């Protein structure tokens, strides 16, 4: 299995357990997800108590969680942006990715910088369509994944900047 981690925060963003493809210009990974509902039950046998000494038996509560499987599996945390705050974030994020690329993959810098401006403009034009998710540690300098839905309105997918990720085999 391959886990994709943010190169800035080290947070897990997604894995190859999902359908992953590159966007047309290769700047994003598009990760297809599914809406799922999970029940988190607590095993009563794990609660240390003498059941025979109890007068009444209380059942432990279970919780039901619904959401996109990518978000739930990798414990992504929802955050929010308006146009102004996203511009501030993305400017700093692109600068950080450019710096990392200069250190580790200098041949990618020009292509990344050429493509990112056009993609950011597209994101800003459709900002109202996206939900934003950070990694589990909610590092404000780390990657923010963009959640949107396909044309059918029911199939969720997320966009992650390819150059902001480190692929790690498990």
From Swiss-Prot:
Alphabetically ordered keywords of this record: Calcium, Cytoplasm
GO molecular function, one term: calcium ion binding
Top-rank taxon: Eukaryota
Keyword Ribosomal protein: no
Chain's role: Involved in calcium binding and microtubule stabilization.
Species name: Lateolabrax japonicus (Japanese sea perch)
Intracellular or extracellular location(s): Cytoplasm
UniProt-listed Gene3D superfamilies: Metal Binding Protein, Guanine Nucleotide Exchange Factor, Chain A (2.170.150.10)
Family membership noted in the UniProt record: Belongs to the TCTP family.
Chief subcellular location: cytoplasm
InterPro entries for the chain: Mss4-like_sf, Mss4/transl-control_tumour, TCTP, Translation_control_tumour_CS, Translational_control_tumour_p
Protein name per its UniProtKB record: Translationally-controlled tumor protein homolog
Lineage: Eukaryota, Metazoa, Chordata, Craniata, Vertebrata
Keyword Calcium: yes
Disulphide bridges, residue numbers: none
SUPFAM superfamilies assigned: Mss4-like
Sequence ranges assigned to domain TCTP in this UniProt record: 1-170
The gene coding this protein: tpt1
GO cellular component labels: cytoplasm
């Amino acid at each position: 299995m391959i886990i994709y981690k943010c190169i800035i925060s080290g947070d897990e963003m997604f894995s190859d357990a999902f359908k992953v493809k590159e966007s047309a210009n290769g700047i994003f990974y598009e990760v297809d997800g599914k809406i799922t509902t999970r029940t988190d039950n607590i095993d009563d046998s794990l609660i240390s108590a003498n059941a025979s000494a109890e007068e009444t038996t209380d059942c432990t509560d279970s919780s039901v969680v619904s959401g996109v499987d990518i978000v739930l599996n990798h414990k992504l945390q929802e955050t929010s942006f308006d146009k102004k705050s996203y511009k501030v974030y993305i400017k700093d994020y692109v600068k950080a990715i450019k710096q990392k690329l200069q250190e580790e993959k200098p041949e990618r810098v020009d292509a990344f910088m050429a493509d990112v401006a056009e993609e950011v403009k597209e994101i800003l034009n459709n900002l109202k369509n996206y939900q934003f998710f950070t990694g589990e540690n909610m590092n404000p300098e780390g990657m923010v994944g963009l959640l949107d839905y396909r044309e059918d309105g029911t199939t969720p997918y997320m966009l992650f900047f390819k150059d902001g990720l480190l692929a790690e085999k498990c």
